[in-house]
Amino acid sequence: MKIRVGFGFDVHQLVTGRELWLGGIKFEHELGLLGHSDADVLIHAICDALLGAANMRDIGYHFPDTAGEFKNIDSKILLAETVDLIAAKGYKVGNVDATICAERPKLKARIPEMQLVLAHLMRIDVDDVSVKATTTEKLGFTGREEGISAYATVLIEKAE
């Protein structure tokens, strides 16, 4: 069996007047993430990791922020399409390990919900999706609550 590893990263600025979506679920928060799509940094990092593992470039290549059809798109659609893209190359998702870096809102209570959504979209077991949350202890742009970042590592396998 052939396996490959990918790494992804994304960051978006926090602004007023936008909804906050993380891991495919909506959070009630006074700020949301600015972006061409719904700006779900966790899903974007996972997409980049999957595409990188399959040597298929990155999310901006497949879903450019200059394309009108992706304006305000639900990132869950992007993840489902990314899984289809790697499947067309003969790969399936093995597992995901991801971290969201944000001071607020506190994410711990909703991590299981994110795991369920992500597992469903990637057609894998929920036990194969790890989502963690951390802060930067008030340091940097994340600590000043100017933005949220996410990191993801994935393993993909040649489909049999």
Swiss-Prot record:
Cofactor(s) annotated in UniProt: a divalent metal cation
Pfam families, per the entry: YgbB
Protein name according to UniProt: 2-C-methyl-D-erythritol 2,4-cyclodiphosphate synthase
GO biological process terms held by the UniProt record: isopentenyl diphosphate biosynthetic process, methylerythritol 4-phosphate pathway; terpenoid biosynthetic process
Endpoints of the signal sequence: none
Enzyme Commission (EC) number: 4.6.1.12
Catalytic activity from the UniProt record: 4-CDP-2-C-methyl-D-erythritol 2-phosphate = 2-C-methyl-D-erythritol 2,4-cyclic diphosphate + CMP
Biological pathway: Isoprenoid biosynthesis; isopentenyl diphosphate biosynthesis via DXP pathway; isopentenyl diphosphate from 1-deoxy-D-xylulose 5-phosphate: step 4/6
Claim: Metal-binding is one of the keywords in the record: yes
Subunit structure: Homotrimer.
MF terms in GO: 2-C-methyl-D-erythritol 2,4-cyclodiphosphate synthase activity; metal ion binding
Organism: Phocaeicola vulgatus (strain ATCC 8482 / DSM 1447 / JCM 5826 / CCUG 4940 / NBRC 14291 / NCTC 11154) (Bacteroides vulgatus)
Keywords: Isoprene biosynthesis, Lyase, Metal-binding
Gene3D superfamilies: 2-C-methyl-D-erythritol 2,4-cyclodiphosphate synthase
Role according to the record: Involved in the biosynthesis of isopentenyl diphosphate (IPP) and dimethylallyl diphosphate (DMAPP), two major building blocks of isoprenoid compounds. Catalyzes the conversion of 4-diphosphocytidyl-2-C-methyl-D-erythritol 2-phosphate (CDP-ME2P) to 2-C-methyl-D-erythritol 2,4-cyclodiphosphate (ME-CPP) with a corresponding release of cytidine 5-monophosphate (CMP).
Protein family (similarity comment): Belongs to the IspF family.
InterPro entries (UniProt xref): MECDP_synthase (IPR003526), MECDP_synthase_CS (IPR020555), MECDP_synthase_sf (IPR036571)
Binding-site list for a divalent metal cation: D10, H12, H44
Main EC class the enzyme belongs to: lyase
Chain sites annotated for binding 4-CDP-2-C-methyl-D-erythritol 2-phosphate: D10, V11, H12, H36, S37, D58, I59, G60, T134, T135, T136, E137, F141, R144
Site annotation Transition state stabilizer: residues: H36, T135
Textual note on the cofactor: Binds 1 divalent metal cation per subunit.
